[in-house]
Each structure stands twice: as structure tokens, then as C-alpha cells.
A protein has these predicted regions:
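Noncatalytic scaffold domains of N-terminal-nucleophile
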Residues: 2-40, 45-164
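A short, hydrophobic C-terminal helix/tail in secreted or cell-surface proteins
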Residues: 165-170
């Protein structure tokens, strides 16, 4: 969802600006979550990013999901930027020697032999383990509340599913 048009007419994707930081998410619910984690819960930017990602995965599953990827570029204070690669991880019992004995010189591009375990969720946990300040219960409470109480459905979801036919009882 890359936007180049003016979004000032669209209340679903508001523009936020300030003098003490910035929050950029696709959903306003994710931005509000990040804001609350920073201000109400006294978390840091990594806590806010994790909370926003959890909400985004819930309210915008067509854009990001826990069963997917979570690559992050992080900039801890007084450290060089680093990349946390949350694409996929190899299954626990994966052994490259098994591929070699089958005649492969590298992991194939398609098929079961190249399957990886989705790592978005584990990359969020790793980021919090390294740089987070708050506990996971505090960070995840906003996503949990939206999941329990409901949230406005994004039009991208409804448009994506209008072509599907639901089964009917005979």
C-alpha cells in the first residue's frame, strides 16, 4: 500500500506530525497504539514499534501478518543501525547435507525443500529481548483489546473478498 496521492481527505489514514518524534503506520489504530505505548505506558520506540506491528497484523492482515515476514532496520541509541531479518527461519531439523545428498548445490527456489518457518513473531520478540523496556503483556494489550472488542474493517479486506462465494446450506 504505497501512497503517493494526498491523503488529507481520507480519515482512515491520517497524517501525524510533531516536534518530539514521529509514528508512521498504515492504520491509525496502530499509530494510536504506538503513541499510547510511548506516552501512557512509558515505553521506548522499540516497544511502540512492536505494539504497532501486533495491531497492524490484526487490522491489516492483507499487508502484514504474524505468519509472515518481519524485517526491521533498527537504530539503537549510540549504536550503528542494524537489520533484524525476520523473513523465515529454517525448520529445526533442516540439514544442508540432506540437500547435497539429493544432488542440490543450494536451497531450491520452490517446493517443500525451501520452506521456512514464518519469523515475523519471533523477530518482534527478539527486538524486544534486545531493546525493549516493557513486558509483552503491556505491549500486546492493545492488539488483544481490538481482537476482543472489534475494530473498523479496512476496505482493502472487503474489496479483496467480494469475489469469494460463501458456502450456503442446502
Amino acid at each position: 500500500s504505497y501512497r503517493i496521492e494526498d491523503n488529507s481527505f481520507n480519515s482512515f489514514i491520517p497524517s501525524y506530525s510533531g516536534t518530539n518524534g514521529a509514528i508512521a503506520t498504515h492504520s491509525n489504530l496502530s499509530s494510536i497504539t504506538a503513541y499510547n505505548i510511548l506516552n501512557d505506558d512509558k515505553g521506548n520506540a522499540f516497544d511502540a514499534a512492536a505494539g504497532a506491528m501486533l495491531v497492524e497484523g490484526l487490522v491489516n492482515p492483507q499487508m502484514f501478518g504474524m505468519g509472515g515476514e518481519g524485517v526491521m532496520i533498527l537504530k539503537p541509541k549510540d549504536q550503528s543501525p542494524l537489520v533484524l531479518n525476520g523473513n523465515t527461519i529454517s525448520p529445526k531439523k533442516f540439514n544442508f547435507l540432506n540437500l547435497v545428498t539429493r544432488g542440490y548445490t543450494e536451497v531450491p527456489d520452490e517446493g517443500i525443500l525451501c520452506a521456512g518457518v514464518p519469523a515475523a513473531f519471533s523477530s518482534i520478540f527478539r527486538m524486544l529481548q534486545l531493546y525493549g523496556k516493557l513486558d509483552f503483556r503491556t505491549i500486546s494489550k492493545y492488539a488483544k483489546e481490538y481482537a476482543k472488542e472489534g475494530y473498523p474493517l479496512h476496505t482493502g479486506i472487503t474489496v479483496s473478498y467480494t469475489h469469494l462465494t460463501l458456502p450456503t446450506k442446502a
